[in-house]
From Swiss-Prot:
PANTHER family to which the protein is assigned, alphabetical: DNA REPLICATION LICENSING FACTOR MCM FAMILY MEMBER (PTHR11630), DNA REPLICATION LICENSING FACTOR MCM4 (PTHR11630:SF66)
Any one cellular-component term (Gene Ontology): MCM complex
Keywords: ATP-binding, Cell cycle, DNA replication, DNA-binding, Nucleotide-binding, Transcription, Transcription regulation
An individual GO BP term: DNA replication initiation
InterPro entries: MCM, MCM_4, MCM_CS, MCM_dom, MCM_lid, MCM_OB, NA-bd_OB-fold, P-loop_NTPase
Record carries keyword Nucleus: no
The organism of origin for this protein: Methanocaldococcus jannaschii (strain ATCC 43067 / DSM 2661 / JAL-1 / JCM 10045 / NBRC 100440)
Protein family per UniProt: Belongs to the MCM family.
The protein's name in its UniProt record: Uncharacterized MCM-type protein MJ1489
Binding site for ATP: T329, D330, P331, G332, I333, G334, K335, T336
Signal peptide extent: none
Length: 682
């Protein structure tokens, strides 16, 4: 049998003999398994090669992999015969595609799954199967597939099957020497699309190496613009240099399957046993959170929140399961280390807004010359689309007004709509966002609203479930601990004994080795759980929301966030029910977060509007001054500053406060100042 692409361990028998031996058997298989295709007269029939292999046609599948075009033509012959036995006629223009190679044929000699980086000259003309993430997709264009010609000189009609590489197909010449004319109404066209795919990082032999790409040609494409795909196709060579015999390798796809995007991780019985063993510990969440980012000292609340973000809440119709987190950090805290560490989890991606354009977050539609030489519109999915089903780790997050609506849609509905250049598509962006940025003035100021300190619009800011300011506050004892940890960290990389003492690479708990690989497997296993909220947990959530609404200015968004966090906490402990413990933990995380960013010391309450730049107290004062100007404007179109100040003083508003309030009313577009010191309503 074939143990890897292009390496045959057994001598193939005569091709015609192999085909004739399986003809009746294959015809019977197609008549039984693809009976629905025949009855419905489907134009495209997809044959599952793994199923065919298990059916007993091992030698034919091996033949097809080494001779894909001849093998598919033979399947088509047998399908036509099967079709005839059921319908007493032959099909017209049926297209045969194949998918799902048996495992033995998509494993390399090294024992790893076949990937883009394994496509070499030895695989040319063979059948291969690999996964990729779409990084560019052209618009759909018609491609001539079956051409009907007529000779204007002798009247002879000619029919030709057109291959994707036959660029001279429309300049066919008759035997008499005259150039043939294409008969448009008879000729058959198919939908053609060109995509470029990147090898997923989780399938890279060395994730530190630059990612590998390959161009794929799709025929009969429904229009695929983003996501993770599995391609079954034939590597072909395309000459690029006119002077040298050097070629580029592309893939002619026979089948393209859009995957759900979630990375599949193989777990052994031993893995599951160890996961369940650790899950029994009361401190399991703390252990995993601390080991998730061992390079960073402290910040346990943030580590815990990020761990729960990776596990996710429970997906429900119309409700996202992903938890969005924003870190606002003073310089030198290590936000990039946190983001890059989380990006190492399969399915997650890292990107910095400083090194990518704004549309690099969402998607771009640009005109570009494709491999077939045409200048056309193409979609280039951005970070949020490529991180579908994972986490988008965004460094130096800033969002301009032009991009705001796209990112807002991605955060809330988890899709991105694109309509430009004849391309109208809805791209999936079901991902969590772990973003980080520095305060505008260098260091975070708890006295100033979050919105005023960062370049992120208020509507987007409100979509983050958790916002953590990480401040660099001088503390002698704490500074000493951090300094010692940093020095030991450098020593641990070179000294195995210190490494073990620190537990940098791994920590042994109850006989289980807790390392990066184990945590990834634990997260993947925990994600599969779907705990239901218990009555007692429900009561806690309801009471929390009602009590907080009485005293504090919070919204239903905080309740939704608490539910997602509680579900993730229950999943982290492998529970089937979200109980009181999980609800309390979620409420504590939300409350701690609000203390940092939404506590108003003047009123002693939590006010989420303070995050967005306007606290309840300030909002009341804005309303008061606006009403004063409104009342005074009934007497005069332009209201004098002195008159406003006099009335405001009666309402308890001081002069210095009034200046800021008037500036904000102008900023919000409620009033303007056509002349110095004179205002009017808008």
């Amino acid at each position: 049998m074939i143990s890897s692409y292009g390496d045959v361990d057994m001598e193939l028998r005569d091709e015609d003999l192999i085909l004739e031996e399986v003809r009746d058997y294959l015809t019977a298989y197609l008549r039984n398994i693809h009976q629905e295709d025949i009855i419905l007269d489907n134009e495209r029939v997809v044959v599952d090669l793994n199923q065919l292999y298990n059916y007993g046609l091992m030698e034919f599948v091996e033949f097809l992999i080494n001779n894909p075009q001849k093998g598919i033509d033979f399947i088509k012959e047998c399908y036509n015969d099967a079709y005839y036995t059921l319908r007493n006629e032959y099909p017209t223009n049926v297209i045969i595609a194949v998918k799902n190679l048996p495992k033995i044929f998509k494993t390399t000699r090294k024992g790893k799954i076949f990937t883009i980086e394994d496509i070499r000259s030895k695989t040319l003309g063979k059948l291969v199967e690999f996964e990729g993430i779409i990084v560019m997709a052209s618009k759909i264009r018609p491609m001539l597939k079956k051409a009907y010609y007529i000779c204007p000189k002798c009247g002879r009609e000619v029919v030709r099957e057109i291959d994707i590489l036959n660029t001279d197909s429309e300049k066919a010449v008759c035997e008499c020497g005259a150039e043939l004319n294409l008969i448009e109404h008879k000729s058959i066209y198919t939908d053609f699309q060109e995509i470029k795919v990147q090898q997923p990082l989780d399938l890279m032999e060395n994730p530190e190496e630059p990612p590998k790409y390959i161009t794929v040609f799709l025929e009969n494409s429904p229009g695929i613009y983003a996501g993770r795909v599995k391609i079954t196709g034939i590597p072909i060579k395309v000459k690029k240099s006119k002077k040298l015999p050097i070629y580029d390798i592309h893939v002619k796809a026979l089948h393209c399957e859009v995957l759900d995007g979630e990375v599949k991780i193989k777990l052994t019985n031993s893995d599951i046993e160890n996961i369940k063993k650790i899950a029994k510990r009361k401190d399991v969440v703390n252990i995993l959170a601390d080991r998730l980012i061992p390079e960073i000292k402290g910040h346990s609340a943030i580590k815990k929140a990020v761990l729960l973000q990776q596990i996710k809440g429970v997906k429900k119709p119309g409700k996202r399961a992903d938890i969005h987190i924003l870190l606002i950090t003073d310089p030198g805290i290590g936000k990039t280390v946190i983001l890059r560490k989380i990006a190492e989890i399969p399915g997650n991606l890292y990107g910095s807004v400083t090194t990518a354009t704004g549309v690099g977050l969402t998607a771009a539609v640009v005109r570009e010359k494709t491999e077939i030489g045409e200048d056309t519109w193409v979609i280039k999915p951005g970070l949020l689309v490529k991180a579908h089903k994972g986490t988008a780790c965004i460094d130096e997050l800033t969002v301009n007004k032009e991009l705001q609506s796209y990112v807002l849609e991605a955060m809330e509905s988890q899709t991105i709509h694109i309509s430009k250049g004849g391309i109208n598509a809805k791209l999936p962006a079901e991902c969590a966002i772990l973003a980080a940025c520095n305060p505008r003035w260098g260091r975070f100021n708890p006295e100033v609203s979050v919105a005023e300190q960062i370049n992120i619009p208020a509507p987007l800011l409100s979509r983050f479930d958790l916002i953590f300011p990480i401040r660099d506050v001088s503390d002698k004892d704490k500074d000493k601990d951090i300094a010692e940890y940093i020095v030991d960290l450098h020593r641990a990389y070179l000294d195995e004994k210190i490494n073990r003492e620190m537990g940098l690479d791994y920590l042994e708990v109850d006989g289980v080795k807790i390392d990066k690989e184990f945590i990834i497997k634990y997260i993947y296993y925990a994600r599969q759980k779907k705990p239901i909220i218990s009555e007692k947990a429900k009561e806690l959530f309801v009471n929390y929301y009602v009590e907080m609404r009485k005293k504090h200015q919070i919204t239903a968004r905080q309740l939704e966030a608490a539910i997602r966090i509680a579900e993730a906490h229950a999943k982290a402990k492998l529970k089937d029910v979200v109980d009181e413990e999980d609800a309390k933990e979620a409420i504590n995380i939300i409350t701690e977060c609000l203390k940092e960013i939404a506590y108003d010391p003047e009123t002693g309450i939590f006010d989420v509007d303070k995050i967005l730049g306007v606290s309840k107290k300030e909002r009341d004062k804005l309303t008061t001054v606006y009403e004063i100007i409104k009342e005074l404007s009934e007497k005069s179109e332009l209201v004098e500053h002195e008159d406003i100040a006099e009335e405001a003083k009666k309402k308890g508003i001081k002069e210095d406060e009034l200046e800021n309030i008037i500036k904000k009313l102008i900023k919000y577009g409620d009033i303007d100042e056509p002349k110095p010191g004179r205002y009017r309503l808008l």
